Swiss-Prot record:
Residues 1-15 form a propeptide. It is a multi-pass membrane protein. Cu cation A2 binds at C221, E223, C225, H229. The lineage of its organism: Eukaryota, Fungi, Dikarya, Ascomycota, Saccharomycotina. This is Cytochrome c oxidase subunit 2. GO terms for cellular component: mitochondrial inner membrane; mitochondrion; respiratory chain complex IV. PROSITE patterns: COX2 (PS00078), COX2_CUA (PS50857), COX2_TM (PS50999). The N-terminal sequence of COX2 is processed by IMP1. The record marks N15, D16 as: Cleavage. The chain crosses the membrane at residues 31-64, 79-108. It comes from Saccharomyces cerevisiae (strain ATCC 204508 / S288c) (Baker's yeast). Keywords: Copper, Electron transport, Membrane, Metal-binding, Mitochondrion, Mitochondrion inner membrane, Respiratory chain, Translocase, Transmembrane, Transmembrane helix, Transport.
């Protein structure tokens, strides 16, 4: 019993899938997503402080004017308060904007990736190409990924999230995702990895990721792309480097 309790206390269950009525982010698995979470929490703190201050000022003004409206009848403007409510919000916006721009540029940087994976959006499935690897036939390792239909789902699989084949990647490796589309605009989005990039026909967009823990991460197309839009899930399995090489040899 004590061993079971100790296991429960020392085991962290990560939230890497959408959950009903969720009001917060999924657990981060990359430095980019960790930065997004930290920025969100910091901004929310400032917003709550501002909300409390504005609510207190509004309540105070309403109560003051209600008790003695005649005394303030001929006050038309106040230069001091006008200067304050102009400068103070500008300072707050600068405080918020500065770290936002830093994070934005950091997320866009792709520095010396160890491998490149190309994700191509189709109506309504994904195709993945491991451009750095060639199989025994001399061809690039590539495969297509389709959603598992409801009637073929097995116990434990997630509806509209599980796919017949998964993208397999190694952890602690700088990965560059090159994203495009073959027909209409799609969007390659995996919340836990902090990835959301448009897949545009005729254009190559790129984003990097450094996955720091093993696990299965789910995403989906986040751009309305037709009647089968809901049937474009993304499933990424992050494994250790030896397991990744073993999987690669099987392709």
């Amino acid at each position: 019993m004590l061993d079971l309790l100790r296991l429960q206390l020392t085991t962290f269950i990560m939230n890497d899938v959408p959950t009903p009525y969720a009001c917060y982010f999924q657990d981060s698995a990359t430095p980019n997503q960790e930065g997004i979470l930290e920025l969100h929490d910091n901004i929310m703190f400032y917003l709550l402080v501002i909300l409390g201050l504005v609510s207190w000022m509004l309540y105070t003004i309403v109560m003051t004017y209600s008790k003695n409206p005649i005394a303030y009848k001929y006050i038309k403007h106040g230069q001091t308060i006008e200067v304050i409510w102009t400068i103070f919000p500008a300072v707050i916006l600068l405080i918020i904007a500065f770290p936002s721009f830093i994070l934005l540029y950091l997320c866009d940087e792709v520095i010396s990736p160890a491998m490149t994976i190309k994700a191509i959006g189709y109506q309504w499935y994904w195709k993945y190409e491991y451009s750095d690897f060639i199989n025994d036939s001399g061809e690039t390792v590539e495969f297509e990924s389709y959603v598992i239909p409801d009637e073929l789902l097995e116990e434990g699989q997630l509806r509209l999230l599980d796919t017949d084949t998964s993208m397999v990647v190694p952890v602690d490796t700088h990965i560059r995702f090159v994203v495009t589309a073959a027909d209409v605009i799609h969007d390659f989005a995996i919340p836990s990895l902090g990835i959301k990039v448009d897949a545009t026909p005729g254009r190559l967009n790129q984003v990097s990721a450094l996955i720091q823990r093993e696990g299965v991460f789910y995403g989906a197309c986040s751009e309305l792309c037709g009647t089968g839009h809901a049937n474009m899930p993304i499933k990424i399995e992050a494994v250790s480097l030896p397991k990744f090489l073993e999987w690669l040899n099987e392709q």
